[in-house]
Amino acid sequence: RLGTPAVRPGDALFCRTDVRFTHDYVTPMAAALFREFLGAEARVEGTDSTYAFRDHLTFLDRVMSPKHREMGLLAHANALKTTQEAFCKAQGIRLYDEVPGGGSEAICHNAVLEDIALPGQLVIGSDSHTCTAGALGAFAFGVGATDVANAWFTKDIRVVVPDVVRVDLHGAMPDHVSAKDVMLKILADPYIKEGKAIGQVLEFAGDGVTRMNLDERATLTNMAVEGAATTGI
């Protein structure tokens, strides 16, 4: 998968992705880059493992202020929707779209965790909380439009191997304590508060993690990005 038997922190290489997804803010930007640099006839590679979500802007028409409407922001947002739909249709990408009455078929990072990603996979997404899928034991992290456009065409992503910090959890949580409480405590640790975890991977381990269900583990990995980590696993 990597083309080399082993890697160490700091190594830079291209890795083959297993899952690629974008939401409604980034799909149009990545599509524009895709067409500009690869040509109008370029095709997305691996559409069976490529997904798009309309989940960030679905209620915008209900909450946008009159002032912002007058500025034309709602029209711009609707243009993002049209562009995303057209690109997905042309390329054969599965789009989790709006549903009648408002809302979306799915929230991207939740759907990837629940229905798409598998343990051991490499998952990239345009959402900062792509790291949620780390609860499965996947290496999942957020990327920008340029990386997405490249991965659409090649299925590859450039990775600088990050350092790993292990977080050992032991014992059982009392009834009044949730996984979010645990993660907030971790985020308050000086190691993270002083920025030492920036760009690193938070590896959660120990019998305390073993006792957690998947939703609780997903809370830990979802919030890894709040400590400026690349991901949690």
Report residues per predicted region:
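Fe-S-dependent hydro-lyases/dehydratases of central metabolism
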Residues: R1-I233
